[in-house]
Amino acid sequence: ERLENYSLIDDRIKQLSFTSREDYIKYLKTGHVFLSCARSEGWNLPLIEAMSCGTPSIYSNCSGQLEFAEGRGIPVRIDSEKAANTNDYGRYTMSDLPGNYYEPDFNHLSEVMRDVYVNYKTYKEKSLKESIEIREQFNWDKVADIGLDTINDFLSRKPWLNRPVRENQINISYIDGPKVEI
């Protein structure tokens, strides 16, 4: 439906949803390019997973994903930025939430996609090198530590909640992807 809204219906575009974790990782490893050009993004776990697999990754140069992606992968310039509560993205608007939407520069996106296609070998080699850095810096334990630090930082700013989370209060499991319970 979203693709129809932007006249992007094409038999070559495959939408996969609710695949098994095993198939999902297989697609990330065997795909030629990972594309995540969202208007708004949090941590963007699929992007960091694609990057850790050594897949050339194109992404919007905005939001929380810059925590790990900045200086890596293939960023797409942002054309404009506006408050999320402007409510002009139709039913996909989360206007009650704070934050901004970022409009990717779609001309730049097409240039980047063409460049990756033409120079695929170079981008693949670069992505494989970057994947080593990503896996060393952002394994599950390190990401859980980042999350714990963020939670404790948040709690320390709220006097009525001023009680740091202790390690024995956290349960981390990886059965079907990461799951953190506090």
What are these regions, as identified by a protein language model?
Residues 44-49, 57, 64, 68:
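A short, glycine- and acidic-residue-rich donor-binding loop in the catalytic cores
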Residues 114-115, 119, 140-178:
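C-terminal alpha-helical cap of glycosyltransferases
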Residues 26-31:
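Short alpha-helical donor nucleotide-sugar binding micro-motif in glycosyltransferases
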Residues 100-111, 118-149:
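A charged, aromatic-enriched C-terminal amphipathic alpha-helix characteristic of glycosyltransferases
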Residues 1-25:
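Nucleotide-activated donor-binding/catalytic signature segment of Leloir-type glycosyltransferases, i.e.
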Residues 56-59, 74-77:
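Short hydrophobic beta-strand element within catalytic cores of glycosyltransferases
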Residues 39:
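Aromatic "clamp/platform" in nucleotide-sugar-dependent glycosyltransferases that forms part
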